Amino acid sequence: MGINLFWVVRLLLEQRSVQLTEDEQRLRQFCFPLLNPADVARLCRMGTWEYIEVGTCLVEHDRTLARLSVIVSGKADVRLDGVKVAELGDGQFVGQIAYITGEKAPVSVVAQASMRIISWSRVKLETFFKDRPDVEIQLGHSLGADLTRLLKSAWQSSR
């Protein structure tokens, strides 16, 4: 009983004391609305925050990806055989198809404007998810919703 009470108190204190930065709050709003601030903060500490310049290739067609990224701010083009087929913006995942399937990237993704992203290595995420399957489920929901938006956008623009 004492051990359980310890963990309950620790979790409550952890939840209460977490202050997310503006970028972390945006990430939570876009991708992880059901996660508590402490879990979002953990994910953010595990990730690598980067500024990306215009023209930078984030995903190269037919290459294996070792990371999953989210655009916190900025825009990127999704290209298939050099032709723009979709556009990604704030709160959208980069490389989600390759991450989900574990296969090579079916498209290229190139920054069309300066961007701020956060990325996680597949290995770090898989290690984290062993102890936190609830966070993995939330990521799966977010990836599915984002992929649905991307496919719907591509379908509508092809009409």
Place the predicted regions along the sequence by residue:
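Regulatory nucleotide-sensing modules
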Residues: 26-81, 86-98
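Juxtamembrane/interfacial segments around transmembrane helices
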Residues: 3, 23-30, 49-52, 118-123
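Cyclic-nucleotide recognition modules
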Residues: 5-8, 39, 86-144, 148
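Short alpha-helical interdomain "coupling" segment at the junction between an upstream regulatory sensor module
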Residues: 151-159
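Short, flexible segments with low predicted structural confidence
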Residues: 14-15, 81, 119
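Transmembrane alpha-helices and immediately adjacent membrane-cytoplasm interface residues
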Residues: 1-21
